[in-house]
Amino acid sequence: MAVDTYTYTSKIESILDKQSSLFQLSTTQLYNKILENNEGELTELGAINAKTGKYTGRSPKDKFIVTEPSYRDDIDWGNINQPIEEEKFLNLYDKVLNYLDKKDELYVFNGYAGSDEDSQLKLTVVNELAWHNLFAQNMFIRPSTNEEAQEIKPNFTIISAPHFKADPSIDGTNSETFIITSFKHKVILIGGTEYAGEMKKGIFSVINYLLPKDDIMSMHCSANVGEKGDVALFFGLSGTGKTTLSADPTRKLIGDDEHGWNNNGIFNIEGGCYAKAINLSQKKEPQIYDAIKYGTILENVVVDEEGDVDFDDNQYTENTRAAYPIHHIDNIVTPSKAAHPNTIIFLTADAFGVLPPISKLTKDQAMYHFLSGFTAKLAGTERGVTEPEPSFSTCFGSPFLPLNAKVYADLLGNLIDKHGVDVYLVNTGWTGGKYGVGRRISLNYTRQMVNQAITGKLRDAEYVKDDMFGLDIPVEVEDVPQTLLNPINAWSKPEAYRTQAQDLINRFKSNFEKFGEDVDELAVNGGFE
């Protein structure tokens, strides 16, 4: 790792040395503390449910990176990576430590991010709340023993004080809430929000800064491996089917959200899963449902007086969650790492109905679509009219990328070349017309296409190039209707298809302009210029 040492300030050392700083508590001990402190409620599934108050999701406007000379020029500053001066940070840091020093109890966890020891970040997590500490134990990688935990000298520390509130006029924040990362001081400082996902995504952002510095790819994707050791990566924004398609009973899960790719292969950054729980059912998503048991943290789920859970109720938020250790899932790789990928799948739910259900990408096209990170969401209007709305998230994870996007795209391109990876763009959205006119592509057909891709059956298939997007479409895929494969054939009026396709192409081009002249060549070779 680029950063491998960290010296605690004397203030942190004194806090951690106090008897009231409870180190590496077991799940049962943390359950007892959570219930004793009225931080959560026990459910009939055995999981703890905690409410996060007014923040039921991430707070991107309150996320900062400290501007320090050693790395100031590396960061892609803007609305996502907002700067805060080091002096402001240190003053706030000091106030938070003084606040925590007065607490009756704190909860401390030592663990890791990264299941490959060659690319591992050692962590200390200091929590004001016991349920946050159990969340950290679930999401990060636990040491095998307490003795191992005590030996950890952290590269990075999370200090979480959700009940401490900043004063924006003094502290330089935008509100009472703050998530501040200092690469110099190796700290993520969190206050004013009880949403536990800030810890998970805070470390992911740190990883996305550190790993590329060592020419290691960090990725917002899921990954699985087949019986023959063939590895597949799945990239996709919310609603594209990433969780559903990567949860394959014939393949073992490496991880569901965050991965690294180094000289050894693919490795999970996390030790757990943070699954969406809204409308969860055992029938639809048995793997996730069955993982919700003793040791799991539920967030903002509706629970009645008898402890019965209603996953369909969005009373508190649509963003209900379940955080559980990955060993709650049966069909996993242990440890969570595997060889270099054979196949990469980019998932998009195209509500315009013009992208092919599956197409094979060249390296340049893969880099272009990786930078674009396209899907389409459905925006309701006051009059009840719904129109597709394009959504572009750079590298399928723009909120968590501290470096310039081209750094990640270049790394991906080099790895595709080096390991001969097949890359496919899979549309899980509409065909035969846009949303409201066309129809959703059958999940069974999508599964069949993905299965053919990741087992290598499409590698040497016959392809035809579509004349709008320049994408290579397979002439046939076993058990998938041929008329479905080329989208123009699914539309009743070819000219209407071309008009809609050109509209989407224009949106891609407009979005790509934000990357500037550095990617002009890529726009020509991989895009629609």
UniProtKB/Swiss-Prot annotation:
Residues reported to bind ATP: 201, 220, 236-244, 285, 321, 440-441, 446
Reaction it catalyzes: oxaloacetate + ATP = phosphoenolpyruvate + ADP + CO2
Subcellular location as annotated: Cytoplasm
Listed GO CC annotations: cytosol
Chain positions recorded as substrate binding sites: R58, Y195, K201, R321
Pathway given in the UniProt record: Carbohydrate biosynthesis; gluconeogenesis
Binding site residues for Mn(2+): K201, H220, D257
EC number of the protein: 4.1.1.49
A Pfam family assignment: PEPCK_ATP
Co-factor: note: Binds 1 Mn(2+) ion per subunit.
Keyword annotations from UniProtKB, A to Z: ATP-binding, Cytoplasm, Decarboxylase, Gluconeogenesis, Lyase, Manganese, Metal-binding, Nucleotide-binding
Annotated coiled-coil segments of the chain: none
GO biological-process terms attached to the record: gluconeogenesis
GO MF entries: ATP binding; metal ion binding; phosphoenolpyruvate carboxykinase (ATP) activity
Listed PROSITE patterns: PEPCK_ATP
Cofactors that this protein relies on: Mn(2+)
Alphabetical list of CDD domains matching this protein: PEPCK_ATP
InterPro entries: PEP_carboxykinase_ATP, PEP_carboxykinase_C, PEP_carboxykinase_N, PEPCK_ATP_CS
HAMAP family, alphabetized: PEPCK_ATP (MF_00453)
General function of this protein: Involved in the gluconeogenesis. Catalyzes the conversion of oxaloacetate (OAA) to phosphoenolpyruvate (PEP) through direct phosphoryl transfer between the nucleoside triphosphate and OAA.
Family: Belongs to the phosphoenolpyruvate carboxykinase (ATP) family.
Protein name, entry field: Phosphoenolpyruvate carboxykinase (ATP)
Protein's gene: pckA
